[in-house]
Amino acid sequence: MRLSSVMPRGYALFDLDHTILPFDTQALFCNYVLQQEGWRRIYLAWFLVSLPLAALKIFNLRMMKRVFASYLVGMKKETLERYVKEFLESDFDKALYPEVVAEVERHREEGRTLILNSASPDFYLAGISKKLGFDHHIGTEMTVEDTMPMLPRILGPNNKCEAKIVAMHERALISGEGEMLANTWAYSDSSADIPLLSIAENGVMIHPGNRLAEEGLKHGWRTMTPKRPYNGRWGGRWASVIQAMGFYRLK
């Protein structure tokens, strides 16, 4: 991959889940909503039924994202917007990795363009982007209706893997297709983001698993291991399960 010098200002590209905070933000926001309206746990009845369909690849990740979001069924748009605002100032704020937020602030001070690029539904990404001072944000485009339906619509692809790179090019946020971006840092915890890390001159892995760590070793990517409120990846998965049921309490 050729090194581009077209944009000397550079970029700082950040994944969200398990990168800026130690949780899946979809599950953490679900946890917050269920603690406000406990009756919404009824969504678990059909979500659990859908899991075998996902295992059999009858439902893809895009569809499962819609099924999971069914905990919002019947919610008014203004209520959802209020919950997002409250969530960002409470549970989300408590969960942030201070060390990674400091990296965001460093890149801002050094003049790089900050891009939050996540597979999460975009209805809360605008607030996260504003809160943390990003210049741009990209997520999975989930439609917010005046009253939320059982299966919210997703416009476009699930913003994951190479789709993140395509989205940045389509929005003209980056240039030089096929080129490595000079003076640029990319941050992620996931091997799904190897494409994102690979286009940056500097890659930073957050608690990488084996596959990502092996790839990072080839490229000389840096590793960060901020303190997590659980032990290992299985601890993180268990936290997501508890959050999906609305019973997780942040310390």
Q: PLM features: residue spans?
A:
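Active-site neighborhood of HAD-like aspartate-dependent phosphohydrolases
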Residues: 2-59
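Residue-level signal for pocket-adjacent positions within structured domains
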Residues: 15-16, 67, 137, 149
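Membrane-proximal basic amphipathic "stem/tether" segments
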Residues: 44-49, 56-63, 238-251
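C-terminal cap/substrate-recognition subdomain and adjoining C-terminal extension
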Residues: 2-3, 7, 82, 89-115, ...
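Short, compositionally biased "basic patch" segments
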Residues: 50-77, 137, 141-142
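Metal-dependent phosphoesterase signature
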Residues: 64-98
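Conserved active-site and cofactor/substrate-binding residues in soluble primary-metabolism enzymes
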Residues: 24, 75, 163
